[in-house]
Amino acid sequence: MKPVLIHTHFHKRKTGVTRSIENVLPFFTDDFETYVYGSNIDGNKITTSKLKSLLFSDRKTVVHCHRNNEIIRMLCYRFLGGKFTLIATRHAETIPSGLTKFLLNKADKVITLIKSMSNNLGIENTIVGHGVRVGEFVPNSEKKLEKISQENIILNAGRVRKEKGQLVLLEATKILKEHENWALVIVGQVDKPPFLEELKAIAKKYEIESQVYFINETRAIISYYQVAKIVIAPSFSEGFSLVTAEAMSCECSVIATKSVGVHSELITHDKNGYLFEAGNVLELETLLSKSIKNEIPLVGKEAREEIIKNWSAKKEAENLIKVYKS
C-alpha cells in the first residue's frame, strides 16, 4: 500500500502558491496516494472525515502545508494524537514573524524556495525551487489577443501593487510613444484601485494610454505569455517568481529585477534574459528600448532551454519526494 501525501490549501482565492501546488501533483501518484485538502485548488480532494481517518490511523502519511493557518490546523490534530509527517514550505522572502518561526519549528521538515530565503530563515531547511509544466507552458506563435490592436506585446503578469514595480514599469515604457506597434499589457489582480488610477495617470501623462492595457487576473495566462515578445518582472520583492519561469518556458524574452526572488538564479544576464536593479527606471528603459530596436537579441529560445533543463515541475516533484522520504 502506498504512503499518503496530502497538500493543504486554506485560501479564499487561487494564487501563485495554488499554481505551484497544482503543477507538481501529477508527478506524485507513482509514489503516493495523493490528495489535496482545502478549497480553491484543483486536485483529488479529500473530505475532513477522510483526512481524520488517515491522520489517526497507522498509514504512513505526509502532510505538506503552505500557510500558517494550515500548520496550526495540523498541529491541533497532532496534539489530539494524529500521527503524520508535517512538511512546511516558506513561500515569502521576508524575515518571518515570531509566530511563523514558531510554527515552522514545529514542522518535521521545512522547505524554502531560493538561496536568500534559506539563508535568512534561521531554521534548518531544504531548498526546493518551484517548477513549470513545460509541456503546457509552450510557445505558440499563432496565438493572437482580441481587442489589442498592436502587433508586438510587452507583458507584465501578477499582482498589481507597488511592491511589484509597476510604477517603474510605466515610467520606463514612455518610450512606447516612439513605437506605435508595441503595447504594454498588465494582467493581474489590483490590490488597491487608487494605485491602478496612478498607473493610468502615468500612461496618460506620456500619451501612451492607447498602448497600455489592464486585464483582470485570469487562469488563461498561458495565452498572454504566448503572444508576448517581452515579459518584464520589475518587482522589488518576490517569494519565488513563478511568472518569470513560466514566461521563459513560453520563449518570452524576460527583463527582470536583479537579486529579487529567483530571478538571478533563473537568468544569466545577456544569455537567457536580462537583469536590472530594482527601481532603476533608466536601466529598464534602456534594456527595453534596445530590445524593441533589436539592438540586443530577444532570447526566448535560450530561456526555455534553461527552464526545461533545470526548472520543470517534474524536477521539483522529484526533489520534494526526496524530502518526503528522507
Map each language-model feature to its residues.
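Acidic anion/phosphate-binding donor-loop and adjacent secondary structure
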Residues: 98-99, 119, 132-147
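Aromatic "clamp/platform" in nucleotide-sugar-dependent glycosyltransferases that forms part
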Residues: 217, 236
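Conserved acidic donor-binding segment of nucleotide-sugar-dependent glycosyltransferases
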Residues: 268-270, 274-281, 289-295
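Glycosyltransferase donor-sugar binding loop
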Residues: 38-41, 157, 183-197
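A conserved mid-protein helix/loop that constitutes part of the nucleotide-sugar donor-binding site
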Residues: 16-23, 152, 161-180, 184, ...
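Short His-centered aromatic/hydrophobic patch
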Residues: 65-70, 90-91
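Short hydrophobic beta-strand element within catalytic cores of glycosyltransferases
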Residues: 253-257
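A charged, aromatic-enriched C-terminal amphipathic alpha-helix characteristic of glycosyltransferases
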Residues: 297-325
